[in-house]
Amino acid sequence: MEYIAVAEVLNTHGIKGCLKMRPLTDNIERFDEDICYYLGDKKVKVTIQNYRMYKGFLYIDFEEFNDINEVLGFKKQYLYIDEKDRYELKDGSFYIDDLIGLKAYFNGEYIGDLVDVISIYSNDVYVIKNDEKEFMIPAVKEFIKKIDLENGLIDVVIIEGM
């Protein structure tokens, strides 16, 4: 089974085992779904009892925990789902973990690997890095010409100053 992270545990919240998390999904409604979730490095199977969003953070209560001491060890770990429970994406949309590691090319010349995706309000920014330089490229059609997951490639446009 392959696990996909859907939230990062930042801290505990209160004394009853609630966890404060940073969502790693645009689809917050996914936490309403009756699917299996796995918590932490040991992938402990958990059931979401309740969740809420507040100021961009996700707060989740699990049926399995009702005391802060039971969840302290999960800080800086992740909440996962099984890959089979991923949403189908529209054409032209990609999961970030599928993009990481793509080989980036500009005018047919290798310029580096896609190492990170920064999500900001207007659009994502792809971070492409080689041994000497780092490029930050807006994830818009003017700069991203082609993404080929099958062959592990991304064709980009670089302008002066990137």
Swiss-Prot record:
Subcellular localization(s) per the UniProt record: Cytoplasm
Keyword Coiled coil found: no
Chief location of this protein within or outside the cell: cytoplasm
Domain named PRC barrel: residues: 91-162
An annotated GO BP: ribosomal small subunit biogenesis
One GO cellular component term noted in the UniProt record for this chain: cytoplasm
Similarity section: Belongs to the RimM family.
Quaternary context: Binds ribosomal protein uS19.
Protein name, UniProt field: Ribosome maturation factor RimM
Origin species: Finegoldia magna (strain ATCC 29328 / DSM 20472 / WAL 2508) (Peptostreptococcus magnus)
